[in-house]
């Protein structure tokens, strides 16, 4: 068993659906977790597929909620966005960008390959100070309510196994292989250093 709590980050594009669903579930299980996005702005489904509603990362979830409520309560209730923003507001005030975080983590989960690439690139561009390893793991999770929940439970299962592990370094590869077989998904994994 690890001597200190596992420090986990979950990262998606906008820090609204996938990373926040995992944040919610991991937090309920008592894990030390933070969540982030990587894009320059938060993009939510708009009135048409090619017209997203765009917010700055400094916009709180409550401000987004109230704005969408005012714009089209029925649409954003029907597509689940108001529910998601309400959940998010109960977890933290607003979205955060990974590139602006200076905290260290043991494991960072990303929800799509482009986010994985951004996180790894960002970590590799930072000046190494402590040489503490961080495992970056990508599992592709579609940006839907159902897939976000399924992905969050898989992330939670991996975290719980790692929390019980004596040595992350020795056990992670084998654990990921078992989870790939169980979930029918393949994961990307690399180690970076702080």
UniProtKB/Swiss-Prot annotation:
InterPro entries: Ptyr_pPase_sf (IPR036196), RNA_pol_II_suA (IPR006811). It comes from the Eukaryota. Keywords: Hydrolase, mRNA processing, Nucleus, Protein phosphatase. GO terms for cellular component: mRNA cleavage and polyadenylation specificity factor complex. Its EC number is 3.1.3.16. SUPFAM superfamilies: Phosphotyrosine protein phosphatases I. It catalyses: O-phospho-L-seryl-[protein] + H2O = L-seryl-[protein] + phosphate; O-phospho-L-threonyl-[protein] + H2O = L-threonyl-[protein] + phosphate. GO terms for molecular function: RNA polymerase II CTD heptapeptide repeat phosphatase activity. It is found in: Nucleus. Pfam families: Ssu72. One of its GO terms (biological process) is mRNA processing. Protein phosphatase that catalyzes the dephosphorylation of the C-terminal domain of RNA polymerase II. Plays a role in RNA processing and termination. Belongs to the SSU72 phosphatase family. PANTHER family: RNA POLYMERASE II SUBUNIT A C-TERMINAL DOMAIN PHOSPHATASE. This is RNA polymerase II subunit A C-terminal domain phosphatase SSU72 like protein 3. The gene is SSU72L3.
């Amino acid at each position: 068993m690890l001597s200190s709590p596992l420090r986990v980050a979950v990262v998606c594009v906008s820090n609204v659906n996938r990373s926040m669903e995992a944040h919610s579930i991991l937090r309920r299980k008592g894990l030390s977790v933070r969540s982030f996005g990587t894009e320059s702005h938060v993009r939510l489904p708009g009135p048409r597929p090619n017209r997203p509603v765009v917010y700055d990362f400094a916009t709180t979830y409550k401000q987004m909620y109230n704005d969408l409520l005012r714009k089209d309560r029925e649409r954003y209730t029907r597509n689940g966005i108001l529910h998601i923003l309400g959940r998010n507001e109960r977890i933290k005030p607003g979205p955060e960008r990974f590139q602006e975080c200076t905290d260290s983590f043991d494991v960072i989960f990303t929800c799509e390959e482009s986010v994985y690439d951004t996180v790894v690139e960002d970590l590799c561009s930072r000046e190494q100070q402590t040489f503490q390893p961080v495992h970056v793991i990508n599992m592709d999770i579609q940006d839907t309510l159902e897939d976000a929940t399924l992905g969050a439970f898989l992330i939670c299962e991996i975290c719980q196994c790692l929390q019980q592990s004596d040595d992350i370094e020795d056990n992670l590869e084998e654990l990921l292989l078992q989870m790939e077989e169980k979930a029918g998904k393949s994961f990307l994994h690399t180690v970076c250093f702080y």
